[in-house]
Each structure stands twice: as C-alpha cells, then as structure tokens.
Amino acid sequence: MATQEAPLFKIHDATVRRKEKVILHVDDFELAEGENIALLGPNGAGKSTFIQLLTREVLPLHRDVPPVIFRGQERPSLADIKACFGVVSNTMHDQVRVHLPARDIVCGGLFGTLGIPRHVHATEADFKKAEEQLERLGIGELANRDIMTMSTGQVRRVLVARELVHDPQALIFDEPCTGLDPEGMYQLRGVMRQLASEGRSVILVTHYPEDIIPAIDRVLLIKDAAIYADGKKEELLTGDCMTELFGVPLAVESNHGWYSLREKFDEGE
C-alpha cells in the first residue's frame, strides 16, 4: 500500500508576535512538494513574515505540538530547510554593494555567503557550477563582469543563479520585480516560468497580479496579519476580491493565464 507523501510544509495555529503585537496568525496551511503559490496582499499585511515563518527566520509562539512541520518533521534542522530553499529578495539585492564578478557572487551560494569567503578555496568545479547557472539563465557573458556595473535586472538574475547553484527544491521570490524596468520584469518572469517548468516549487510574494506566472494556480491572500483567502487564482483574482484586499476600487483583466490590475475610477474622474 503506497504511503501518502508528506507536504513540504504544514502549519497549524501558528502565531508570530513582535513585542506584544500579533504580526501574523495562521490557522491552517499546507503546501505540497512541487506546488507553486503566490502570496498577495498590501504592505504590512504579513506576507514577508509568512515567508520568514517557513524559513525559520522568525519562530511562532511555543505549542506542545510545533505549529510548523517541514516534510513531516516537527523539529527539522535549519540546515535541511536552507538546503530546500533558495530565496531572492530586495533585502539581498540591497546587500550587493561589493566590487565582485558575477561568477564569485554565484559561487558564494555554495557557502551561504555573498562572494567567496576568505578562508575558503573555491575549486574549478565550484566555478564551473556557478558559470553553468549563469549560462542557464542566459547571462553567461556576465560571469567576469563587476556586479556593480550591471543593471538592476541583471543583478536580480545573478542572485537567482546564486540560489540555484546549491540546487534547491523550492525558490522563494519576495517582491522580485520591484525596481525593474519592463525588460527586467519580462526576463525575471521568464526565469520563474523556467524554474516552474523544471518541477521546482515557485513561491512568489508580490503586490501585483502581473507578477503571477501562468504556472502558479494557487493564490494566498494576506490581510491584517492573517490568511484572508486561499484558493484558485481564477476565483480570487477578481475585481471584488482585489478591491476588498487592498481597500480601493480595482478591476482585474486576464489574458492567456496572465492577470493585470488597474484602478477603477468613476466616470469623469
């Protein structure tokens, strides 16, 4: 008799506090292995805290039964969680203020550092892995270029390559298109599509339905430090839901699996 595979994550009755304030409460949530999902909501709703709960950057209030279970383990090691995930965020982008070639930035992903640590001797095999990931994302020609001379979109793809170099099963994109021009957005959304097609989980945090690639079927709406709704994107990416979520009149349009959001003004405004 086949046993059912444990979900990647299972959360039950998890509360995160900052000082005396609840900044996130999750009643029930499960994410299957290989599942793609988008977290959508306004600033301060709890989206980033939700991701930090998954990656153990924040811990929930203690319960006799741990509220967050990873692959069936009640007390997984931090090393196991880090090995599973790659994270691309604006915070990481802001830390890239060093004159290093892209190859060294990507190679640092093998050691969990930004660049190669001084006490580590990177091998030719390490550099080859880094170059392969840059090639895979269509930026192999940037391998020896100083990252400080690159466009925002190029840097963002270098950071994706840095996460891919340790072969994670899931990629978290936290507001990945912030600060990008249309070309950069196009390229990064293409990267997410590529990773999803390979069977990796894509977990996207965003304010904008435009960032949600067609391969993402499930949407989690976060509002007021809690899950407001969880379901199929075609059911939740509607004008009524978005208006309720963001608190202003909004309309949603869809085209071949892509969604776009626009303000809805009264006639004459």
What are these regions (language model features)?
Residues 167:
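Conserved catalytic motifs of ABC-family nucleotide-binding domains
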Residues 121, 146-150:
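Conserved ABC ATPase signature
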Residues 206-207:
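H-loop/switch region of ABC-family ATPase nucleotide-binding domains
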Residues 243-269:
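ABC ATPase nucleotide-binding domains
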Residues 219-232:
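H-loop (His-switch) and adjacent beta-strand-loop-beta switch element
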Residues 171-175:
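Catalytic Walker B motif of ABC-type/P-loop ATPase nucleotide-binding domains
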Residues 122-142:
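Conserved ABC ATPase "signature" region
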